[in-house]
């Protein structure tokens, strides 16, 4: 399976140990089960985010296709910039057998959260990182991967909308 960051594991262990001593619960097996559950939720979150990349890209692809088919589309709608939807990093993720298997086995999906996926897409499309990505002369796998790294670092991580969604759903993390 995917390697979870050592710092995250240490934090989870310390949280469980703290809880173990605070509650006065002498059952070490309960603490171990809590740790394993917490780590599993971290894995789920990791895979949810990978799946989110694919879902956001697929949504944009559907939007571009719909615009092409409308009555009297503009030249830009007929010939849109497809760099975002042709991102090689996303294509690699979408074909990753480990990701597909995990998503299928765990039943992970964004299908019930299309409005959230649309909001994430809108946030990305309105970001300076996206504008720079489209203008970048260099077109390579590395620039595609770097785009998504920056999006996660500067747009998704710490985004109030995403944090609110996670706290409301309590499905992951």
Language-model regions, residue ranges each:
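N-terminal, charged low-complexity regulatory/assembly segments
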Residues: 3-162
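Short, flexible active-site loops
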Residues: 166-168
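Conserved small/polar residues in nucleotide/adenosyl-binding loops
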Residues: 170-172
């Amino acid at each position: 399976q995917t390697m979870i960051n050592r710092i995250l594991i240490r934090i989870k262990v310390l949280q469980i140990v703290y809880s173990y001593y605070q509650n006065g619960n002498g059952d070490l097996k309960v603490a171990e089960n809590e740790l394993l559950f917490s780590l599993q939720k971290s894995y789920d979150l990791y895979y949810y985010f990978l799946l989110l990349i694919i879902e956001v890209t697929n949504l944009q692809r559907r939007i571009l296709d719909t615009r092409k088919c409308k009555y009297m589309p503009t030249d830009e709608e007929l010939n849109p910039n497809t760099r975002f939807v042709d991102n090689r990093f996303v294509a690699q993720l979408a074909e990753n057998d480990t990701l597909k298997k995990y998503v299928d086995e765990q039943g992970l999906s964004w299908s019930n959260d299309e409005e959230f996926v649309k909001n994430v897409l809108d946030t990305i499309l309105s970001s300076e990182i996206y504008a720079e990505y489209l203008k970048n002369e260099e077109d390579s796998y590395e620039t595609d991967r770097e785009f998504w790294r920056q999006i996660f670092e500067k747009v998704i991580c710490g985004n109030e909308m995403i944090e609110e969604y996670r706290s409301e759903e309590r499905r992951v993390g």
